[in-house]
């Protein structure tokens, strides 16, 4: 890989984790510059050494950001298919970029008196205080000084950042990163060189991509060029007039709303310019709709400062000015202004905008009620009242006798999951128009979601509903019982098993029963629960023809096997003609041992090919199982079938250890001459003196006249 390629990849990786680095500085240690410098330096060192950051016990608040950075590095290297031998070079170059760029900015930041000094000063005063009133005064003074201190730091930091950005004067347009990367042309950028902060901030985000791997900064400029069909420079001009402070909300990791609104021409860059920098992020947090314009976003996002400015400048589109002034009063909880608007009624449009969950945090729901027509906004009001657990408003909606659809009630019940308000749950479930088994757009029912979020009380309540369907399959072909089993929700399985209408042996699309799923998932406690049900079936077959017992043996699940064993016919053959004992010879010695302890086990049962367990073990050269079988009191060691006796099979398979075990078995009734001939044949087989392996050993007559070396041979076999 070329050096230039390494640098480019390192720059992209830097851009990928830049958001996390900024979060550490702005959100975790916003004013603590020493900690900023220490923690970012630590991250730089860790990335340089291994590409992975170890959690720092001195700063546990960094854990989440460290996890995200580590995952981002892993995902990026995997996506780019970076060769292992190049990774260390990439890590070192990335750490250098962080050090020379991000960390350097922190180091150059002016540091004021540390907050710890203020804390120490006021702690000394508190220790000297003699009364609670005196302590309260000291604490209040401390709060005021801290506020002033933080304000001064914030102002100084902002000024420093602006100076740093502004001082990066662009002297060679062709060498500017935006031009070199082909994001803008020299001609497009030249008229706006004076906006150094914006241009240089855009460069910081140049390597951030969207889901289609398109650089977000590039996407931003493409939107600007195509916004006005007959004037490609107009929106570009509006973009270049923006403050650098708004860049993160335009192309940061959480900028999807604004980009979507711009892309669909619902808002313009001029609209964004009218939004206060501190409020722009709120637009990225709301749930936007296809008909939203800038004022819709401002109201839904509680951008009250921006809204005031738009009212003052008359940029209110088709909205009524009085309505918007009332909205501001609601946001500010201004009782005097609200009283002045007693006669004002909010339109259905504004009422619905205010009843989004984001905006509704900004005002008192009870204040809003006097200004809306409940019939116009019944659905949105029901959702918001449920979210804020306002049972009185919910009852007020119902008392108006508005027709509420089942899907609306279902959605309200979903919302209530977050609070588990039993009164609201009972009230909403009591509606006759409710279809409790209705699927939402994702194919889930109320019961599905209650199980997913482990809401035991809600599951219990839903199961008691007269119309609940417990055997209904979801869009993936699974029942709620299977869902609870897969999620290992033992208490919910208990609740489901108490339902009389439950079909406990119902198969899914793979012909697997709930019991088989629990076994395959190694859910021992759930298996015990299912086995306790009176209607459980143990021998149901899946699409491969295997039963629960087959899978227990195949997967060597000994503990589950012990639980299953009392319920099974231990000598029943499976579809391949094997008994559990024979099946375990190939799969599980632990299960094999457990089966041998059963008094009803048939250790001599032949499979469909006519082989006994002992013969299978001999063919498999499994000396451990041969020894275990020979120790069983019912084992037959001299019975002859189409494969001969066990002794003959041992010789034919050249198994020295098995021969010793058989010859020493008390049920082997042979004289010394016969033993000598067996040993001779075995030695001949080992030495390949028997040339034709196709002739079964049972067809070779024992030569009882051969006695030479008998004592020596017997002694070598421990006889």
UniProtKB/Swiss-Prot annotation:
It comes from the Bacteria. GO terms for molecular function: RNA binding; RNA nuclease activity. SUPFAM superfamilies: Ankyrin repeat (SSF48403). ANK repeats lie at residues 377-406, 408-438, 442-472, 476-506, 510-540, 544-572, 576-605, 609-639, 642-672. Gene3D superfamilies: Ankyrin repeat-containing domain. SMART domains: ANK (SM00248). Pfam families: Ank_2, Ank_4. Keywords: ANK repeat, Repeat. GO terms for biological process: RNA processing. InterPro entries: Ankyrin_rpt, Ankyrin_rpt-contain_sf. This is Putative ankyrin repeat protein RBE_0319.
